[in-house]
UniProtKB/Swiss-Prot annotation:
Domain of life: Eukaryota
Sequence ranges on the Extracellular membrane side: 1-10, 72-100, 166-188, 327-364, 430-486
Lineage: Eukaryota, Metazoa, Chordata, Craniata, Vertebrata
Residue numbers covered by motif WTKF motif: 294-297
Protein keywords: Cell membrane, Cobalamin, Cobalt, Cytoplasmic vesicle, Developmental protein, Endocytosis, Gastrulation, Glycoprotein, Lysosome, Membrane, Phosphoprotein, Transmembrane, Transmembrane helix, Transport
Name this polypeptide is given: Lysosomal cobalamin transport escort protein LMBD1
Pfam families, per database record: LMBR1
Gene of this entry: LMBRD1
Oligomer and partners: Interacts with ABCD4; this interaction induces the translocation of ABCD4 from the endoplasmic reticulum to the lysosome. Interacts with ABCD4 and MMACHC; this interaction ensures the transport of cobalamin from the lysosome to the cytoplasm. Interacts with INSR, adapter protein complex 2 and clathrin heavy chain.
Tagged with keyword Glycoprotein: yes
Ranges spanned by the short sequence motif YERL motif, renumbered to the chain: 232-235
Modified residues (Phosphoserine): 528, 531
PTM remark: N-glycosylated.
Length: 540
């Protein structure tokens, strides 16, 4: 018989893996932010803020497999609870995860609504050399106050918004919906926190639709297509230089006799001279790229990039198929929009929903897969942001360039990634709803068996995978799932957002297929902050 210490042992295993992953996350965030920040405009506070905010989001997402691991390890594969998993211990373990979410989500609210806006506006004011540091802080606090007010409003609305599902539904499914809404508790503080985080997750959904969906198609196709040849681009650039020089010479020849140039020719001459400066700058960068050992090294890795591109597009198709089947299942079998399209049981199986519970039985294989999925979303989101840029409606605010991203753009970048990572938890639920809800838990059901040797029927207890049909005391729902479904209207918005995600992915796939190869120095024409003596890092 297992001793009470087994509970502590199981808990320690899950949290030890979480601790190791935490260290890996911090290392990844430091490398990632340092890779993109500008070398000439690097600021310590903005760098630390970007690393910390991105790390908090990733750590929160890393709590998902810990949550699933702990509820799964309360039960044996035969559907019975383990000896140590009595009601008090189960509640204690669940509360441990819940307190983890409380802490991390509170820190996220602090970062999004106070610290990141404050640092951003501080550096916006710092660009003005005439202002003192005290004035910069006061101005930054004044603008940040608006974000604090928004956060306070979200907390107030979340604390008192009605959670009751419609009472005109009498079916057993609606009783289950009501149970799920009430399971996490009726605390106003918890409801306020959940509402605020769900609001941020909704914004993250919009960012995922804009950037991640496009990046999932752009990243693999860019790897497969590669970039244009530096030598060929340099040849074309040389021809353009000669052509522009001829135009300049033609215009200047009109004033050889001392006559002043007409205003039209002056404007044309100015444009050609500006164009010539840009072309010569491109010439220097192309020459550097062509002779670089890094270019030759990347050329040798070209077959590997093609293989990675094919792998990424296959993974993208796997996600899209799983998401489509999951959403179709909700459309056909859910309890409706008033329940947030909550689904009871998997009527249409999808690949990830079948794979994750199998991997979960061999810890930490599912942890590894979840980490890969989250990292995949991060890299595809980054690819989308690099291709599209950061926009406010039709105005481009910032470009994201490796080694050339300004402090303000870096904060924007990490804010967007933070919101996308928040939405990742719901994306994983959409891809594998049964896994996120119950993990690998089984419960016992009574089955009647007719025996030829004995008159009458006998009953046999057989294990069955946990689903919404299971008795409430036989299966433990993850805290993550309950956080995601505290408010039904957010779940409904996520459902429609998934369809939009699929649509944007298909559009991005078509656009990426139609676009030609990227320039080996793409962006050099637009980057006014590139100095002539700094031709370094480009994507090759």
């Amino acid at each position: 018989m297992a001793t009470p210490g087994a509970a502590s042992a199981e808990l320690v295993i899950g949290w030890c893996i979480f601790g190791l992953l935490l260290l890996a996350i911090l290392a990844f965030c430091w490398i990632y932010v340092r890779k993109y920040q500008s070398r000439r405009e690097s600021e310590v506070v903005s760098t630390i803020t970007a690393i910390f905010s991105l790390a908090i989001a990733l750590i929160t997402s890393a709590l998902l497999p810990v949550d699933i691991f702990l509820v799964s390890y309360m039960k044996n594969q035969n559907g019975t609870f383990k000896d140590w998993a009595n009601a008090n211990v189960s509640r204690q373990i669940e509360d441990t995860v819940l307190y983890g979410y409380y802490t991390l989500y509170s820190v996220i609210l602090f970062c999004v609504f106070f610290w990141i806006p404050f640092v951003y506006f501080y550096y916006e004011e710092k660009d003005d050399d005439d202002t003192s540091k005290c004035t910069q802080i006061k101005t930054a606090l004044k603008y940040t106050l608006g974000f604090v007010v928004i956060c306070a409003l979200l907390l107030l609305v979340g604390a008192f918004v009605p959670l009751n599902v419609p009472n005109n539904k009498n079916s057993t499914e609606w009783e289950k919906v009501k149970f799920l809404f009430e399971e996490l508790g009726s605390s106003h503080g918890l409801a306020a926190l959940s509402f605020s985080i769900s609001s941020l997750t909704l914004i993250g959904m919009l960012a995922a639709i804009t950037y991640t969906a496009y990046g999932m198609s752009a990243l693999p196709l860019n790897l497969i297509k590669g970039t244009r040849s530096a030598a060929y681009e340099r040849l074309e650039n040389t021809e353009d230089i000669e052509e522009v020089e001829q135009h300049i010479q033609t215009i200047k020849s009109k004033s050889k006799d001392g006559r002043p140039l007409p205003a039209r020719d002056k404007r044309a001459l100015k444009q050609f001279e500006e164009r010539l400066r840009t072309l010569k700058k491109r010439e220097r960068h192309l020459e550097f790229i062509e002779n670089s050992w890094w270019t030759k090294f990347c050329g040798a890795l070209r077959p590997l990039k093609i293989i990675w591109g094919i792998f990424f597009i296959l993974v993208a198709l796997l996600f899209v198929i799983s998401l489509f089947l999951s959403n179709l299942d909700k459309a056909l079998h859910s309890a409706g929009i008033d329940s947030g399209f909550i689904i009871f049981g998997a009527n249409l199986s999808n690949p990830l929903n079948m794979l994750l519970p199998l991997l979960q039985t061999v810890f930490p294989l599912d942890y590894i897969l979840i980490t890969i999925i989250i990292m995949y979303f991060i890299f595809t989101s980054m690819a989308g942001i690099r291709n599209i840029g950061i926009w406010f409606f039709w105005i481009r605010l910032y470009k994201i360039r490796r080694g050339r991203t300004r402090p303000q753009a870096l904060l924007f970048l990490c804010m967007i990634l933070l919101l996308i990572v928040l939405h990742t938890s719901y994306m994983i639920y959409s891809l594998a709803p049964q896994y996120v809800m119950y993990g690998s838990q089984n419960y016992l059901i009574e089955t009647n068996i007719t025996s030829d040797n004995h008159k009458g029927n006998s009953t046999l207890s057989v294990p069955k995978r946990c689903d919404a049909d299971a008795p409430e005391d036989q299966c433990t729902v993850t805290r993550t799932y309950l956080f995601l479904h505290k408010f039904w209207f957010f779940s409904a918005a996520y459902y429609f957002g998934n369809w939009a995600f699929l649509g944007v992915f298909l559009i991005g796939l078509i656009v990426s297929c139609c676009k030609g190869k990227k320039s080996v120095i793409e962006g050099v024409d637009e980057d006014s902050d590139i100095s002539d003596d700094e031709p370094s890092v480009y994507s090759v």
